Amino acid sequence: MSICTREISLEILNLIYNGITFDEALVKVENWAKLDARDKSFVKMIILTLIRRNIEIDLILSNYVKYIPRDFVTNILRIGITQILFLRIPEYSAVNISANLVKKRKKNLTNFVNAVLRQICRDKEKLISNLHIQKNIPQWIFSNWKKSFGIDLAQKFANQCLKEPYLDINIKKNEFSLKNWSNALNGKNLFGEIVRKKNTGSIEDLSNYSDGKWWIQSASASVPVNIICNYFEKINYCKTNILEVGAAPGGKTTQLCDNKFNVTALDIS
């Protein structure tokens, strides 16, 4: 993997810390589209791991620097720490590439970045042993979970927030019985027409991507439409009008249309 992947990771992270969403940042960073699937997966892994653990990473960083400015140098350090502590990246690679990134932009801070990351490498075992997943959850949220569900469930919720989510795929009703979709998509049928699989590789490479036979929709998002279908099961769906407000990204809208409802979907432009 070339330094280009870290360059692009830095560009994306700079945008995110300036209020741009992850998806918007991917569009704005010109070189993102030029990466192959493997490098795109690597960049996403860096950024999403960093975002999920950003509170913890900044707490660690605060032990090594007196002040954490909102600039690209801090983001380079964040990317370096993410690779050293949470990803299977050789330490020397994470440190050297981070130093080269800052050298291109602010040469006088190269030794600083190099020194901080090398010290983190030396302290790696101690830092990992002191990691607490719940630190990545805002305290008020974790306290509410603990009060409502108890400490064990609250901890499980925190653990789940750090995991890569599965990819859920909803198959069109008239297509579902015509093919073994669990095998075709390398997943498993959860319920109804929902197939769940590990979120790896490019969606465009999945079976029948261009044929309009399925769409991406989380299993939980499909439940409200299932309830509506059960409620109106004795009525001609074509004569039932559904108004969906806040319709993006469109999974429930597509599901309603697939069930022959007359749908009006609204969202901000």
Where in this protein do the model-derived segments appear?
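Class I Rossmann-like S-adenosyl-L-methionine
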Residues: 1-205, 238-241, 259
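Rossmann-like S-adenosyl-L-methionine
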Residues: 179-269
